[in-house]
Swiss-Prot record:
Regulatory light chain of myosin. Does not bind calcium. PANTHER family: MYOSIN LIGHT CHAIN 1, 3, MYOSIN LIGHT CHAIN 6B. Keywords: Motor protein, Muscle protein, Myosin, Repeat. It comes from Homo sapiens (Human). Residues 10-40 have a biased composition (Low complexity). This is Myosin light chain 6B. One of its GO terms (biological process) is muscle filament sliding.
Amino acid sequence: MPPKKDVPVKKPAGPSISKPAAKPAAAGAPPAKTKAEPAVPQAPQKTQEPPVDLSKVVIEFNKDQLEEFKEAFELFDRVGDGKILYSQCGDVMRALGQNPTNAEVLKVLGNPKSDELKSRRVDFETFLPMLQAVAKNRGQGTYEDYLEGFRVFDKEGNGKVMGAELRHVLTTLGEKMTEEEVETVLAGHEDSNGCINYEAFLKHILSV
């Protein structure tokens, strides 16, 4: 009898081990998600503004300005062949009275790679449209530029600014406006609390 008790060997447990093998299929799904996740944050980093089409830029500088610009340009020419490095373009633009951001400089250069900035060179004739594009761009603030400026005064973060505060800014900062001009501009934009929805105000001003 004792040997018969040994007959029911607990080997059936072997097939139960094979059952977990079916689980890897379910476990395989999560890794697929983790692979997709890292790709998402990389996308925003690659977003760049399209380069400026320099062939369409019209040079508006006068003769005196062109002579002055060329003299300044030549000061940055370290080789003596009438060219400067891409990496120097931003410095030359700033020396000529412009104040472009690094992103704006890269945009007019055609969004070059970091190694190209240190190796590629440009002559004055090619640089001039870049300078003109930057000068024109800085003279024309975009909706986002102005919106960012208004947000500084939006202390409540509700999309509104006090009309009195805006009047003070318009009459004392930048290109100062007269009180009459300010009243004309703000007419109809203040609510019962003396506040102004600056997004609607901006859209109205920029559409005029």
